[in-house]
């Protein structure tokens, strides 16, 4: 049973456990600040392969992450819709949102970002949810026998996040402009696949990150238009009661989504 009382002590335990696993016997002076300890832990967790972990590790990790992740939670019930009763735009950290599901912009290997301390959404979601998500994703890939295709959607538990589930989708990667019709359609398919999966599992609400607009380089304005158009068409054509949150992080994306929703209303 997990008995460590502070998150700093938990971080030190997890760091030492992962270093032992790597046969890292170099002398390490533990950082004194929580922030530096977190960065060390996060980097090790990011690069750790999808291998089994001990019950003790999980207990310590879950106690720490659950505590940290529930300190600053935004509940969907506290948000006001921007259009109708079921479309929301919210600026903030998607990993703090209490909701049925959040959408993760994954890569085709489907194991989460394995670059230490990288600030992509895939890295942040996996880090804050816990190692179990990587293990679940690895099992999905093992069962299907191939990398994840662009435009599909798979569901895992949210584990230590306020969100109950994570829906993972691989968006198109843009290598040249203008964006091709094929890649526009693939991005729309990402949103459609996530919406269908949410309804298939009787979820009440889902929050989308800005799929493909980070390192995958989809232009933000085009992506916002496609996201809004696809979601609104789906809700109208299926009569779905699903509540949809467009989660944005930057001021630019916030403005783009507001403009896209206003244009669609004209």
Swiss-Prot record:
PROSITE patterns: MACRO (PS51154). It holds the Pfam family Macro. Residues 74-265 form the Macro domain. Keywords: Glycosidase, Hydrolase, Metal-binding, Zinc. Changing residue 93 to R: No effect on hydrolase activity with GcvH-L as substrate. Does not affect zinc binding. Belongs to the MacroD-type family. Zn-Macro subfamily. Contains an N-terminal three-helix bundle motif with the Zn(2+) binding site. This is Protein-ADP-ribose hydrolase.
